Structures are given as C-alpha cells and as structure tokens.
Amino acid sequence: MRTLTLRILFACIACALLCASASAQETADTILMRYLRQEGLISYPARDIRIYTNGHDKLEDLFRDIDNAKKKVWIEYLIIANDSVGKLCISHLEQAARRGCEVRMMTDDYKDWERGYGMRTKEGMDSIRSLGIDFVTFDRFKFPWYNHVYRDHRKIVNIDDSIGYIGGFNIADYYVNGNPSYGGWHDTHIRITGAAVEGMARYFHQQYQYRGTGGKGKYTFARYLFDEDYRNVNEHTPKVVYFELGRANKQKKAEARNAIIAAFDAAQDTIRMVSPYLLPTHTVRQAMIRALDRGVHVEVPFPKKGDMDMLSYGNFHFAKRLLRHGAHVFLYKGSFHHSKIMMIDGTVSMVGSVNMNSRSLKWDYEAACFVFDRKTTAELDRIFEEDKLQCDTFSLEYYKREFPRKFRHKGWWVDRFLTPFF
C-alpha cells in the first residue's frame, strides 16, 4: 500500500512539473488564441494575405478586384471623399452594378458633411443610388447632435465573399498624395482571400441592417466554397480572428478594448505598436505598463507632425510617461503615420481601424483583426524596421529641448483630463 501511495505521489508531481513546463513554453499567439476562443471569437483560415503601406497600391488592387467581381461588392468606409479618388471609386462601383453585381456602399454621415461625396443632401444620395448602388449613410447627423457621438470608423470591403480588405486607409486623394499641412500619408491595410472573408462579410451585414436604410434579410455565407480551406488547416495556415467595437450588440462595447489588453498581457518578448494617437483608456494604459514592468521590449513610433494639434499635445505627454517605464519611443518624420498595427513576439499581428485613443476604444464603431501568421508578422516587422529609419528617437531630453513649456503644459492637461473625450 505504501509503495502504491508513493507511486501515485510521484506521478502527481511529474504531471504537475510537465504542466508547468508546458505552460512556461506557451507562446504569445497560443495564449492570445485561447483567450479569443474563450470569448467566442471565431478563427478563420486564410489563403493569402497581402500588405499595403501606400494608398496607390491599395486602390489599384481594390479597383481591379471590383472590376473582376462576379456577384457582390460590399464597401464600408468612414470617408469616400468628393474628389478624384472618390469619384473614381464610384465609377468602378457603377460598372460593377451594370454587370449585375449586388453593390452596397456605406459611409459615415458626419464625415460626409466635411469631406464626403455630396451625400449630405437627398439629391446627392439619390444620384448615387440612380447608378445602381444600394447606398446608405451611417447614423444621419441631425439635431440634437449630442445623440450622434458614435461614428462608423471602419474600413472594410467584401468582394464575392472571397476577397476582403481591412485596415486604416479611407478613399480620398489625401490618403494617396498626402496633405500640405503634414506631408505625405503612411498607412497600413491588408487584403485577405479565402474563408477568412466571412468575418468581414458578417460585420458589414450586421452594420448595414442595424443603422442602414436597406440591407434587410438574413446573410448566408457559402462555406461549401471553402471546404478545402477548412479541411487543410495546419500549423502553417494563416488564421484570422476579427474583433470589433460597436453598439449593434451590447456585448461588443468592450470587445476591442479587451482583445488589445489580452494581446499586451500575452506578450513575452516584444510589442511593436503604431498608432497616430496615443491617448488610450485607463485599462489599456495599465496593460501597456504591465508589459513594460515585466520586461517586455516595447517600441512605439508616432507622427512627429499630427493632423490635430490638441491630440499631438497629449501624444507627447503620454509618450513621456511610457519612456519612464522603459518603452522605446520614436517620432516618425516626413509624413503622417496613420497605421493602426501591432506585432507581438513575432508570432501574431493586429491590423484594422482601431486607434490607441478613447474615441476608438470606447465610442466609435471599429473593426480589426489578429493575424496568426509568422510570415505576415515578419513582413510587418520588416516594414516597421524600415519606418524606424525615418524616425527621430524620442527622449525626455528631446521633449524638454524641442517643445516649449507652454506646449508641455497643454499636453499635461490633454493627457490627464481630456483623454476620455478624444
């Protein structure tokens, strides 16, 4: 009996040691994937993932895909501008509609007032619908304006349920050629093919039904077309997990925030993050600081010249706080870096519309995805290293030397008190 007891005891100890060893060897992508599945988020296999960092290449491929569409083109952007690029996009959509494709287009109404395709007026909207485009604007902006603080900041496209686009580019001339006030435009978008497009298609359809004036009916994805994608999944298959922030489903209010926090908490070696705005919510800040405090190497570039002065004040002040916890911060020069990306430990990356500010993390409708693919993450890391060559190193001495006390004081106010509103 005593011998049996000792054997059981040794077996239990051995199992405990094996479990501890397995846990210690878990990589960031494994930890993050487990969290996302526990939250009910779906992992989709992708056939191919292509990265874009300039608007010309992205639009060239997008318009070619629209021209080759056979059944449907669903397109959702914050901005489709009333300029040469926006009109060219409408022209390609019109041709797709003439070929018999189902063409749906959705843009945010508030931004249309400022830079949109004449969509504020009924005449402007009717002129687009007359082209065969089923067009809606998200949440018409009207009195009382305080009821319309939640805007559609997403940038997603679904073509024939087999090609999808997601990222940070809108459809406007300055997303290709830049703006005189802050130089060129640098951004990140990805093109995904295969079964992984289902997630984007579902997000679009849900939004279209929730706030649009059309798009009624249940959406059905033809999974049988991608049976081979699902059958042949292995450890080398790129996998995509989408997450969003939106009020169509109350459970989605914190989904983006919690997913990003989980990514920070999963990191063991490196976090590389790009965002034009560095005014995250308190919980996201704490996750970043936790990663730094446990020795994770964190690199954060942001634009030296921003598109809004008030946000720039806050960016610099929060960057100073990150420095004090050991982060490596860089200032991107020469153009406006609008990317919203993150790479964790070289194993998983994030691309989408989510900025690191309260507006994106609490208020706006957003869409992004984690890409579980070392090849894609390595390519984003390579681009990140190239971008660092266009950066100045940010330090406390640099901050005090280059920016007057008045600027630094404004940054303190924005970072401390106005962060929840930006």
Placement of each model-derived feature along the sequence:
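Bacterial N-terminal signal peptides that target proteins for export
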Residues: M1-L9
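Charged, low-complexity intrinsically disordered terminal segments
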Residues: S21-V136, R140-F422
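Bacterial N-terminal signal peptides
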Residues: L9-L17
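Nuclease and nuclease-like effector domains acting on nucleic acids or nucleotide cofactors
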Residues: T3, A16, A20-A24
